[in-house]
Amino acid sequence: MPIVSKYSNERVEKIIQDLLDVLVKEEVTPDLALMCLGNAVTNIIAQVPESKRVAVVDNFTKALKQSV
């Protein structure tokens, strides 16, 4: 069963491209890009209610592993 997102592909792709454009503009190495994105993810997770954080992290890491 395909996953249905509440966000349009166009919106998601635009945001991803904007993020990648910043990384290219700053000429970051892959390790610096991952460090910056990892810190951003940590900041975003901190905004999730504490009672839901473990589930969010589990889902995020599962999706990340499946995408590699």
Curated annotation (Swiss-Prot):
InterPro entries, per database record: UPF0352, YejL_sf
Pfam families attached to this UniProt entry: DUF1414 (PF07208)
Gene3D superfamilies the UniProt entry points to: YejL-like (1.10.3390.10)
Chain ranges passing through the membrane: none
Family indicated by similarity: Belongs to the UPF0352 family.
Protein name as annotated: UPF0352 protein CPS_2611
